[in-house]
Amino acid sequence: MNATRKQRLWLVIGVLTAAALAVTLIALALQRNMSYLFTPSQVDAGAAAGYQQFRLGGMVKAGSIQRATDSLTVTFKVIDKHAATQVEYTGILPDLFRDNQSVIANGRMQAGRFVANEVLAKHDETYMPKELKDAMAEGHVGKPIPAAAAPLSGVR
């Protein structure tokens, strides 16, 4: 092997190593920033157990909102057709947050409850994002849930 071929070989090896390193770093960065959406039924079934941070989506159970008198801490239940998950959030809630409202909370499970660091409320109680509608429809036996589904008030 002459000097030119050796030089090209080392150049190709260096470029391939740099590309592999770049792909690995990008994959790790994307994996840390991904936030999967789960419903309360999926959380109860243990589907979210492997994730430190995830999104919880569903409806705010009527009458479950409790505000602390001495802080901005709010607790409430997020429900779907089959389950409910207790959520704790410290901060200012969106103006559209209320009972029977579609909500997505970003956070983590801690001591049997979901501790949210962000809460997003939807514009209308009949609106449901496609991702949440699809996730809730998976656990629903029977007709699929339409995008303009009525709020769930009978789940405890």
From Swiss-Prot:
NCBIfam families: PRK13159.1, PRK13254.1-1, PRK13254.1-3, PRK13254.1-5. It holds the Pfam family CcmE. The chain crosses the membrane at residues 9-29. One of its GO terms (molecular function) is heme binding. Residues 1-8 are cytoplasmic. Keywords: Cell inner membrane, Cell membrane, Cytochrome c-type biogenesis, Heme, Iron, Membrane, Metal-binding, Signal-anchor, Transmembrane, Transmembrane helix. Gene3D superfamilies: Nucleic acid-binding proteins. This is Cytochrome c-type biogenesis protein CcmE 1. The keyword Transport does not apply. Heme binds at residues 123, 127.
